[in-house]
From Swiss-Prot:
Region (Disordered): 194-218
UniProt protein name: Ras-related protein Rab-27B
Subcellular location per the Swiss-Prot or TrEMBL entry: Membrane; Late endosome
Organism: Mus musculus
PROSITE patterns: RAB (PS51419)
GO cellular component annotations of the record: apical plasma membrane; axon cytoplasm; Golgi apparatus; Golgi stack; late endosome; melanosome; multivesicular body membrane; synaptic vesicle membrane
GO MF term (any one): G protein activity
Basic and acidic residues bias spans: 206-218
Sequence positions bearing Cysteine methyl ester: C218
Family: Belongs to the small GTPase superfamily. Rab family.
SMART domains in UniProt: RAB, RAN, RAS, RHO
InterPro entries: P-loop_NTPase (IPR027417), Rab27a/b (IPR041837), Small_GTP-bd (IPR005225), Small_GTPase (IPR001806), Small_GTPase_Rab (IPR050305)
Disulphides: C123-C188
Binding sites annotated in the UniProt record for GTP: 16-24, 74-78, 133-136, 163-165
Amino acid sequence: MTDGDYDYLIKLLALGDSGVGKTTFLYRYTDNKFNPKFITTVGIDFREKRVVYDTQGADGASGKAFKVHLQLWDTAGQERFRSLTTAFFRDAMGFLLMFDLTSQQSFLNVRNWMSQLQANAYCENPDIVLIGNKADLPDQREVNERQARELAEKYGIPYFETSAATGQNVEKSVETLLDLIMKRMEKCVEKTQVPDTVNGGNSGKLDGEKPAEKKCAC
């Protein structure tokens, strides 16, 4: 895909405490590489990737394929950058909420991040995937899978255990979030059937005629 050659622009935001591995996770997803020497993110950074999203018909058959430009925003986890980070919440269409499987404190802080999300996101129930990162370090693990799954079930969101080092579930977790977002937009379009004018967007249904950045009420 060339610049501008896409149907949808989707912005995702990676959230979580400093040191949980957000930067290495996103780098693994966009470049399929692992760099353990990244320095702590200061403020906001982002990476990009183009993907093809295949829709499914009611009968389960493959539908139309859409070209999606993903912007993956990487946020600083430190408290001093919190006001800057929350300013980006309303622009994001989905969230990768991450904690470190080797840090119980980062897991406990997921609740604080959820509170900030619910207060600052574009709606009260945005699309979120909970991610327990550093699954490649089982000997250092402090958070068991049952704890994490129970928390994800409480919030009604998917949960994945990932590793930026090995690539485990990195792509799958982002694909799951994208699928949630695209299905939300499709339902929104079906309900409204009104022309979308955002960024010269689509004609009220997922027809992929022009690049569009869409949001939908929760």
